[in-house]
């Protein structure tokens, strides 16, 4: 892979992502550090439509809580990345609270670079399906470039059976747990700012009550020197599971599937109640309101100090 660093350096000088500055578009460094000090986690909420973005920002502003606004390749058919990215960046800049514009599950170095060029303040490179050594190599490359932009990088080690569209998969959780020894070397050689780990959560809808190996969090946290850890597959867990994970070192929780279901149910009820006098934009308002309500609910779980 050939990368033109002269072009990248010019673009880096144009980027200005503050860890804790006056602008509201920030990278993850400051908000994760604050979460660690406060013993809470920040939420990562996906932008699959304008309504999901507007609802999440409104929730953040009403509660005064920072969050991560994310776009994943799995949402491409709902809202193409080239369309979503400028909207997400503008939403973050205009917000009254700190917002991270973040690429979720970037599945190639090229996509991560594209996100940075489009103004994202953070990217996730997901090389969890790659051989371990190749995951290290490509993640380190993304970190080198992203840090020159002033952006942060989340990576993933270990894997989860997943489909971000919410489809079900058979799985054996123990097969996917993150290994602490591999995590220690991975973090040291890549320079990542946050690490998504696997300890029993899954993307999408749980087929049965989840069995979470909280001890894995303890072991990985110890091995990686208290690096901020990330939990994917946050939908469908009980409040106690969230708080247990956070108490052990989870500092970012990704949440999408059950929020999308909640918004869908709200729209279904609205359509049923307004038969014969329905306009499309009314559905959009209903969906935005439902997203806002559910995001606020999750934000309060992740940080019990939030009123």
What are these regions (language model features)?
Residues 43-47, 51:
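N-terminal pre-domain/capping segments
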Residues 47, 101-107, 228-239:
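Glycine-rich beta-to-alpha transition loops that act as phosphate-gripper elements at the mouths
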Residues 238-307:
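C-terminal alpha-helical cap/extension of soluble enzyme domains
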